[in-house]
Amino acid sequence: SVTFGTIFTLAIILGINGCFDFFFVAGDRVLLTADQRNYVISFATIINTVLRTVIICVMTAHQMNILLLYGCASALVIIKAGIIVCYSHNNYTYLDKKAVPDRGAMEKRWEVIYQQILGIIQTGAPTVLATILLNLVSVSVYSIYNMVISGLNGVLSIFISGLPAGFGDLIARREETTLRKTVSEFEVAYYYILSIVYGLAFALIMPFVSVYTKGLSDANYYYPLLGAVIVLNGLLYNIKTPQSMLIVSAGMYRETRWRVTIQGLIIIVFGAIGGRLAGMVGIMLGSCLSNLYRTIDLLFFTPKYITNASPLKSLLRMLLVMVNIIVIYGLSLVYSPECMSYLQWFKLAIIYGVWAVVVVTASAYAFEKKEFISVMRRMLSLVKRKV
C-alpha cells in the first residue's frame, strides 16, 4: 500500500511545475503573448514535454522509485523556464522591470481574476460534484473520459494561441470592417477543425476507452451514454470559442461578469440536481446546460457590442458543425469493427479521419466557399513563406 507520506510528497512534487511557472515565468509569458510570440512558449513546452516523456519512460523501465521519477521529471521545468526567460531578456532589453507599475492600466485585474476563478469552477465542478454526491468509482470512470476531452481541448487551443492579441489590436484601432472579415474567416477555419475533431471524438471515444481500459476490472469503464454526454459537453464548451475569444480581446470582463456568474451557478445547481437523479450523466448534463447558456449568450452579446454584425451567420455555422458531426458519426453506425489493440484503433481512426476531412471540406466549400477559399489561400501562402 502507498503511505500518506508518499502521496503527500508526490502531490508537492507535481505542484512544483505550476508554482515555478507562476512565480518565475508568468511575466515573460504575458509579454510574449501580448507580442503574439506564443511560438516561443510552445517551443519551450514541446522541449519540456519530450524530455519529460523520455525520463518517465526510461526510469519506469528501470523500475525507479516513483518520487525520484517525478522529481527528475518536474526538475525539467527549469529548462522550460530558462528558454522563455532568456528569449524575453534578449529581445526586450528596452523594458525596465523596475519601473513603477501603472495601476491604472491594470484596473480590470480583479475582474479578470474573478472570471478566472469562475472558469476553474466551470471545469472543476463535475469532479467535485461527483466526489461529494457519488463515489470514487464514478470519479475514476469520469477521469478516463475527461482525459480524452482534455487532450482534444489542448489540440484546439493550439489554433487560437496568440489570436486574442491580434483581434485586440483591430478592436483598439476600431477597424470594424477588417475585424468582421477576419473574425468571419477565423470562424470558418475554427469550425472546420472543430467539426473534424469532435466528429471523430463521437465516433472513436468508445473504441479508445475499450482498448485503454482493457484488463481493468475495478469498474465498468465502458459507458456509451456517459461518453456521448461528455463529448457533447466538450463540443458546447469549444463551439463558443470564437465569440469568447473576442471578449478577451476587447477586455470586456466587467461587462460580462454577471453572465459568467450565471453560467457558474447553472452548473452547480443543475449539476447537483442531475447528480442526484442520474449520477455522473446528470452532472455532465448540468455542465452541458451551462455551456449551452453561455453559447447562446455570447452568440448575441459579441455581435452587439464588439463586431456590430448579425448573429445569424455564426448561428448557421454552429448548426453546420452539428450537421457535419452527425454525418461523420454516421459512418460508425455502418462500419464499426471491434478494436482489440491500439494498432486496430489507429487504423480505424485513419479511416474515420479521411471520411471526416471529406465531409467537412465538402460542406465548407458548399456553404462557405468565399471564406473557405480565402483561408486556404492564407494557409498556402504561409506554407510557401516557411519553405
Task: Give, region by region, the residue ranges found by the protein language model.
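Interfacial transmembrane-helix starts/ends
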Residues: 8, 106, 175-192, 196-204, ...
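Membrane-proximal transmembrane or re-entrant/amphipathic helices at the cytosolic face
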Residues: 332-387
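Interfacial/gating helices of multi-pass transporter permease domains
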Residues: 66-71, 105-108, 112, 130-150, ...
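Helix-loop junctions and terminal segments of transmembrane helices
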Residues: 33, 92-93, 149-187, 243-249
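Short runs within selected transmembrane alpha-helices of multi-pass transporters and secretion channels
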Residues: 10-33, 41-56, 69-85, 119, ...
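Helix-terminus/linker motif at the lipid-water interface of multi-pass membrane proteins
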Residues: 1, 58-63, 121-151, 169-170, ...
